[in-house]
Amino acid sequence: LEEGEITSKVKFPPSSSPSFPRLVMVGTLPDLQEITLCYWFKVNQLKGTLGHSRVLBMFSYATAKKDNELLTFLDEQGDFLFNV
């Protein structure tokens, strides 16, 4: 990192909740100029909802104009997709 850059780490504890962990920022950051996503995942079974092309959302970045400005997800075939 260079001087003045902002970095954060977030650790989600195990959850017995049926909903996925969610991080909501309190306050604001400078406008997003670039982003790096890096994660590892292993999917044992995909259960799609009839009529939905997205089965498992992995990451979503919302803006004031659009809920899923950046979205990574797995589709019914198990393909990893990135939408901007």
UniProtKB/Swiss-Prot annotation:
The keyword NAD appears for this protein: no
Binding site for Ca(2+): 67-68
Signal peptide limits: none
Cofactor: Ca(2+)
Example of a GO MF term: metal ion binding
PTM per Swiss-Prot/TrEMBL: A disulfide bond links Cys-38 to a Cys in the C-terminal half of the chain of 163 residues.
Protein's UniProt keywords contain Calcium: yes
Limits of the Pentraxin (PTX) domain: 6-84
GO biological process, one term: regulation of defense response to virus
Similarity remark: Belongs to the pentraxin family.
Miscellaneous information on this protein: Displays strong antiviral activity against the rubella virus (MIC=7.2 ug/ml), and relatively weak activity against herpes simplex virus type 1 (MIC=44 ug/ml) and the rabies virus (MIC=32 ug/ml).
Free-text function comment from the UniProt entry: Lectin that binds sialic acid. Displays antiviral activity and therefore may contribute to defense against infections.
Notes on the domains: A possible carbohydrate binding site is located between positions 14 and 20.
Protein name per Swiss-Prot or TrEMBL: Limulin
Species in which this protein is naturally found: Limulus polyphemus (Atlantic horseshoe crab)
